[in-house]
């Protein structure tokens, strides 16, 4: 008790010294908490994927250009045993697009895909169901559904997409709490009756024990883009990239929009170093107060 009283008397006498150390300690801890939250979000990108370590995207390199593509487009010249593939999810990004609801035009970012998308990614169902088998169905995110219909029940409502086709809302899903590489407002059915006129992408989940190094070695051999067209001499290679690395790839798309987000590891390292320095500063301030 006497020690505590002595410390309080000294702290009150050295008010400036005490205030500086207390403010330094509080500021350091506050900044560390903010930075740690940011760092945690960067390291937990796409954790809503069922298994982000085993889901792969296709990276195509052609004559110095790299882009995300689809394996099935070139599968006539790629020798990957079909039995190694567990799930194939094909989707077409429709960024910078729009739809019409109740006579009003709304900008949107959409993915045209099928129900296999939900075998790779887990979303909480808010209303309706997660089903894209009906070619006239659409699934909205919770925030976008509120933007279109407010507090009304969106299930059964009809929207008109930019291609002139009408779609009926079959479900509403919540956006994941974590950060995601793919961001969208709605999911549309990718069926033969819906032609999107944009390049599709594909995600794959392979069976346990699949030799990914061997598959990527196969893809590293240059192949002709159109082997049946003698005049087309373009060559390409491909590689399968784990989904958890797509966010860090920095591989820009030809169309800038809001669907893809990218991470910067160099920037993250700077923030980690800054967090460590701030933590050390806070520890020094605590030691200064403790040794009074």
Task: Identify the meaning behind each predicted range.
Residues 3-14, 78:
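A short amphipathic helical element positioned immediately N-terminal to and/or at the very start
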Residues 4, 18-19, 270-271:
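Hydrophobic alpha-helical transmembrane segments
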Residues 14-41, 281:
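Short, strongly hydrophobic transmembrane alpha-helices
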Residues 32-152, 161-167, 217:
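Structured, solvent-exposed hinge/loop segments at the ends of secondary-structure elements
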Residues 114-126, 138-263:
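Mid-to-C-terminal secondary-structure elements
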Residues 259-278:
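N-terminal membrane-entry
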Residues 273-292:
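A hydrophobic alpha-helix feature that marks transmembrane segments and, especially
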